Design a protein with these regions (language model features):
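Juxtamembrane interface at the cytosolic side of transmembrane helices
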Residues: 279-280
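Hydrophilic extracytoplasmic domains
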Residues: 163-181, 187, 197-218, 229-230
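Intrinsically disordered, low-complexity repeat and linker tracts
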Residues: 205-274
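An alpha-helical repeat/solenoid feature that recognizes helix-turn-helix modules
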Residues: 1-7, 25-57, 71-106, 120-157, ...
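Intrinsic disorder/low-structure terminal segments
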Residues: 5, 21, 46, 96, ...
Length: 280
């Protein structure tokens, strides 16, 4: 799926027009939920050859990220510091961690804060101020954070097991529960838990982080721009080696046409661009 031609709509172009009107202040606090700054960075970075003034936009996003951090180094300020905010925002910026000292400093400092919210049973609380109870959302976000940014003081396998063992719905349908109600929660708890789990599993498999869609966008563009080989109109002089085919009965089963996992990931890549576009 090509986000530059999604059902005839160039989603990237529309996003381009919006993001180029935003100031650093708009990005960090006023016009956009700070939780979305990571997905915006991911999209601009992936489409940097398409989006106007992309270097400036990326620099502004980085400035907005740093401006959104509290002066005490506890990480993202969204009505105060929390495990959830650090885990929701910072993993999107993993590509800058090894190359940008300011981002690395902010991440490492936030890690010192977030690891304090990990409880003895492996679950995580909302914040240092409100460390209990360990809950699904905060546990998922802490797993996403520490799976992406390895920390010697944090055993991510323990965090993962605590989510699966304590918060997975007993019905076995892949849902996770709201810690406070005990009910399945598809709006918040399940997405947060799965975000942590997916990030963790990606790191175990040695894959790039799931928020970096750069390679997928490039693959889509390369496939779109690949020259189409015209079939030859010359008659073949070679004898056919193909066996004779039986007449179709109409009951044949079509062979697999591709890797479903790859297709779904490319679909998610396009959706990432669409999501960022419509939520800013």
């Amino acid at each position: 799926i090509d986000a530059t031609d999604f059902n005839g709509i160039n989603v990237v172009s529309k996003f381009d027009k919006i993001i180029n009107t935003f100031s650093v202040d708009d990005l960090s606090n006023n016009s956009m939920n700070i939780y979305h700054i990571g997905s915006v960075y991911s999209v601009v970075n992936a489409y940097r050859d398409t989006i106007s003034n992309s270097d400036k936009v990326l620099a502004d996003i980085k400035s907005a990220l740093l401006a959104a951090c509290t002066a005490d180094g506890n990480g993202i300020d969204n009505w105060g510091n929390s495990t959830d905010s650090n885990g929701f925002v910072f993993p999107f910026f993993a590509s800058l961690y090894d190359t940008d000292s300011d981002v690395k400093k902010a991440v490492d400092s936030a890690a010192d804060y977030s690891k304090q919210t990990i409880l003895t049973d492996g679950t995580s609380g909302y914040s240092v101020q409100y460390p209990t109870p360990g809950n699904t959302n905060s546990s998922g976000m802490n797993l996403a954070f520490f799976a992406q940014y390895n920390n010697p003081d944090v055993n991510t396998a323990v965090l993962y097991n605590s989510i699966v063992n304590k918060f997975k719905s007993a019905s076995g349908n892949g849902a996770y529960i709201n810690t406070y109600t005990g009910q399945e929660d598809f709006k918040s708890a399940t997405p947060d838990a799965l975000q942590g789990i997916i990030t963790y599993l990606y790191t175990l498999e040695g894959k790039t982080n799931p928020f970096d869609i750069t390679a997928d966008v490039k693959a889509i563009a390369d496939a779109k721009n690949a020259p189409v080989e015209e079939p030859s109109t010359e008659p073949s002089t070679e004898p056919s080696t193909e066996p004779a085919t039986e007449p179709s009965t109409g009951n044949e089963v079509s062979p697999a046409t591709g890797d479903v996992n790859v297709y779904m990931y490319l679909l998610l890549a396009a959706c990432a661009a669409t999501f960022a576009c419509v939520t800013v």
